[in-house]
């Protein structure tokens, strides 16, 4: 049976070691996962990472939430500056997920995967509202990370320069798309590419 919650949010905070790489899932920063994310980072801090040379941060499916929940992961990465950094992306990354992407790029990540579902300059910090039988997501802030500008009111937005409003599209360093055949066979095209990318760099 199709698990919609798993598809929508994934398994934030879940991680595994594959040879000399840490693969960490940062698939949601919704408030409901706050404790889960914090506990996973605390657990990671106790792991022996001496033989881990690469951090693969998988933000695929991260449609946003509370951008402050990105900080636990980013601080952990900053405390391990000797590790190579790779970020996996897909079309389901939005809002605070794109903020995590920009943070990882700032930390030197090589991006592998698909284009994300939103421009780099976008609306974020959204809240969900239920009205009758309908659920709505309402964003309350506009961000342009590259120009370090933001707006929270109609007046502030109208006063932004045209440059600050111009759409900025993210293109991964290495474009890799999940194939239909691999999906049917349970193969993660993008992760497999990243693991082979690491292997080839070390040959």
Model-identified regions with their sequence ranges:
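C-terminal "post-core" interaction segments
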Residues: 1-203
């Amino acid at each position: 049976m199709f698990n919609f919650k798993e598809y929508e949010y994934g398994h934030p905070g879940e991680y595994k070691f594959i040879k000399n790489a840490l693969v960490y899932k940062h698939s949601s920063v919704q408030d409901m996962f706050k404790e889960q994310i914090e506990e996973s980072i605390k657990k990671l801090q106790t792991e022996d990472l001496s033989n881990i040379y690469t951090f693969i941060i998988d933000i695929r499916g991260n449609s946003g939430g509370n951008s402050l929940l990105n900080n636990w992961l980013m601080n952990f990465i900053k405390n391990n500056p000797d590790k190579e950094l790779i970020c996996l992306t897909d079309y389901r990354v939005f809002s605070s997920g794109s903020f995590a992407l920009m943070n990882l790029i700032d930390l030197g990540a090589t991006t592998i995967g698909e284009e994300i579902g939103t421009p780099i300059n976008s609306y974020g910090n959204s809240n969900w509202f239920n009205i009758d039988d309908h659920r709505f997501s309402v964003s309350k802030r506009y961000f342009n990370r590259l120009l370090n500008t933001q707006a929270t009111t109609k007046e502030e937005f109208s006063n932004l320069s045209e440059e600050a409003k111009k759409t900025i599209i993210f293109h991964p360093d290495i474009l890799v798309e999940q194939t239909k055949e691999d999906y049917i066979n349970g193969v993660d095209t993008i992760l497999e590419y990243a693991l082979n990318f690491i292997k080839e760099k070390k040959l």
